Amino acid sequence: MSASNVSLLHETCRQVAAGGCAGLVEICLMHPLDVVKTRFQVQRSVTDPQSYKSLRDSFQVIFRTEGLFGFYKGIIPPILAETPKRAVKFSTFELYKKFLGYMSLSPGLTFPIAGLGSGLTEAVVVNPFEVVKVGLQVNRNMFTEQPSTFAYARQIIKKEGWGFQGLNKGFTATLGRHGIFNMTYFGFYYNVKDNIPSSKDPTLEFLRKFGIGFVSGTVGSVFNIPFDVAKSRIQGPQPVPGEIKYRGCFKTMETVYREEGILALYKGLLPKVMRLGPGGGVMLLVYEYTYAWLQENW
């Protein structure tokens, strides 16, 4: 193996390790908000006696009826997926960015286009895990009463198969969710970071990067949430058991808009922003600092 190939492999391993650490830290800190977000997104009517009245009400009800572990339902699939997911997210972003560099595009275009490519690639890896995660998150039984992650995955495969009606349902919505988020997230972060002077003070530099990452995650959440709502409706339980109401991504958006109004496409926005705002800052900081440490020590 040539020296250049060894160097490329070494660089990829650093990206995988740094991305995995970033994903693990972010998911462990922010998963409770993801559970709340998903519950809001699958609600169809405020008149439903099981509907949450507010963000505070959702936390109180989940804690009272399902216990502390209720906030960590469905956490195993994202943990299992985080290392390959974040490895794909960051390594393919770097790969697409390098490829686009040969096309003489401006940085203003290179970063969002590379982000879009990384998001679409990431969606392919993560979608089966998302199907299992959403199914577990919307289960309102006590944590100890619900099926295990692997038992639930086997149940989906047995009943619905591996395809777009089974373990890969909601695939187009996942493509839209991740593609648009990464396009906005990376595009905003790197373009803004390059235009705001860095600081020699480590604390100020940390806050500068975290602040830009926070805003990047927030903006990405606002732009991609209609796809996230569609994904939750398709991958979650259908209104009538045995009857599939939500199928394609855009058809689902149309149905939600027609029956519930435009604001229904933004259900769960507050917990999503509360998660992916600070989560976006945390993830990029953990990635950058871990990657820098690995460059110095490995």
UniProtKB/Swiss-Prot annotation:
Pfam families: Mito_carr (PF00153). Widely expressed. It is a multi-pass membrane protein. GO terms for biological process: lipid transport; mitochondrial alpha-ketoglutarate transmembrane transport. It catalyses: 2-oxoadipate(in) + 2-oxoglutarate(out) = 2-oxoadipate(out) + 2-oxoglutarate(in); hexanedioate(in) + 2-oxoglutarate(out) = hexanedioate(out) + 2-oxoglutarate(in); L-2-aminoadipate(in) + 2-oxoglutarate(out) = L-2-aminoadipate(out) + 2-oxoglutarate(in); glutarate(in) + 2-oxoglutarate(out) = glutarate(out) + 2-oxoglutarate(in). GO terms for molecular function: alpha-ketoglutarate transmembrane transporter activity; antiporter activity. Solcar repeats lie at residues 10-99, 106-195, 204-293. The chain crosses the membrane at residues 16-36, 69-88, 112-132, 166-186, 204-224, 276-296. SUPFAM superfamilies: Mitochondrial carrier (SSF103506). Keywords: Antiport, Lipid transport, Membrane, Mitochondrion, Mitochondrion inner membrane, Repeat, Transmembrane, Transmembrane helix, Transport. Transports dicarboxylates across the inner membranes of mitochondria by a counter-exchange mechanism. Can transport 2-oxoadipate (2-oxohexanedioate), 2-oxoglutarate, adipate (hexanedioate), glutarate, and to a lesser extent, pimelate (heptanedioate), 2-oxopimelate (2-oxoheptanedioate), 2-aminoadipate (2-aminohexanedioate), oxaloacetate, and citrate. This is Mitochondrial 2-oxodicarboxylate carrier. It comes from Rattus norvegicus.
